[in-house]
Regions:
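Metal-dependent phosphoester/phosphodiester hydrolase catalytic core
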Residues: 1-170
Length: 170
């Protein structure tokens, strides 16, 4: 397995995806969350984004379905990330930034209901975009916030994917 987490597009370092794509001795890539970050263009870890030509879209914080779709799309334009997705199966789980910083069951540190509406609406559109862009099969399509699943790699490893963020954190 190749394991990665915390993929902040403006900061760069997606070259690791190209290296994963070159590996011929792994069964899968495992992304442990923060596949995208919701911050606006001048937000967290963006100081080098202009020089690296890695400006996020939309330039605002992601809040709407269109925002989240655009953010996934800009990430997927990265040639190294495309190479990894083409070369190896991806097993993924979300953390907080697929929704908003420090998300929990009913809200997030980086969500203001007064200006961004109810967190439940943001959570719903973030979940929809996640499932549109990420290769995750649901055990129950009526419960898109339940991504518990298991993967067996022969008799060597049993990998159990858990959600310790959206439904596991109060």
């Amino acid at each position: 397995l190749a394991v990665m987490t915390c993929s902040n597009y403006p900061a760069g370092y997606f070259n690791v995806y190209a290296e994963i794509a070159k590996l011929n001795d792994i069964d899968a890539a495992l992304h442990l969350g923060d596949y995208i970050y919701e911050y606006p263009r001048d937000g967290y870890a963006s100081q080098d984004a202009v020089a690296l030509n890695r400006l996020v879209e939309p330039k605002t914080e992601t809040v709407t379905l269109t925002d989240y779709r655009s953010r996934y799309a800009i990430y997927r334009r990265d040639a190294d990330l495309q190479a990894m997705h083409a070369a190896v199966p991806l097993i993924a789980v979300w953390d907080d930034h697929e929704f908003a910083n420090d998300a929990w069951i009913g809200g997030a540190e980086n969500h203001d209901p007064a200006t961004e509406g109810p967190f439940s609406a943001r959570r719903a559109v973030a979940l929809q975009a996640y499932h549109e862009w990420m290769p995750v099969r649901l055990n129950d399509p009526t419960k898109n916030d339940r991504i518990y699943r298991s993967f067996d790699f022969g008799d060597l490893v049993s990998l159990h994917m858990l959600d310790t963020r959206l439904i596991g954190r109060e």
